[in-house]
Amino acid sequence: MTDPLIKRSGIQEEEDLTTLKFPRDLKDAKFLLNSEVAILLEHRKGISESEGTEFPQNTLLIHLYYNSINDIIRTFHKTLAYAEKFSRYKNKTSIKQVRTALSKQNLEEFEIASLANLCPEISDEAKSLIPSLKKMEDDELQAILDELSNLRKFN
């Protein structure tokens, strides 16, 4: 399925998730697992708390208004809550095991993060959620999903 044309910087780019064609600004993006986001945000929160601020002042632009700062803080906490709620893997070791297992497969970075975040149970579900996986045979994809399921059980 092809998404509508998106206009960026005066140039029209076509996005197509079935072929993993992303806009230029996402070309070299690192796709994260929700669990990785949660760990990063918890770390940032810990730094803030040790500095005695809700949000580290050195990362804010001085000209931001009070309401904007509150919006940033509120967004930070909402993002952290979301990432924690939907984290499938609770520690760095589990995340590393999942990334290592999926990296051994013939998967793109986006597919790795999507599979780890969504945790589909069967290949048809995975292909519906992540259209680029339609290139894979069902039994090959199911083996990957079964391995992911086993890793989650021991998490």
Swiss-Prot record:
Name of the encoding gene: polr2d
One cellular component (GO) term of this entry: nucleus
Any single biological process term in GO: transcription initiation at RNA polymerase II promoter
Keywords: DNA-directed RNA polymerase, Nucleus, Transcription
Organism: Dictyostelium discoideum
Taxonomic placement: Eukaryota, Amoebozoa, Evosea, Eumycetozoa, Dictyostelia
UniProt-listed InterPro entries: HRDC-like_sf, RNA_pol_Rpb4/RPC9_core, Rpb4-like, Rpb4/RPC9, Rpb4/RPC9_sf
Subcellular location: Nucleus
Assembly information from the UniProt record: Component of the RNA polymerase II (Pol II) complex consisting of 12 subunits. RPB4 and RPB7 form a subcomplex that protrudes from the 10-subunit Pol II core complex.
Protein name (database record): DNA-directed RNA polymerase II subunit rpb4
A GO MF label: DNA-directed RNA polymerase activity
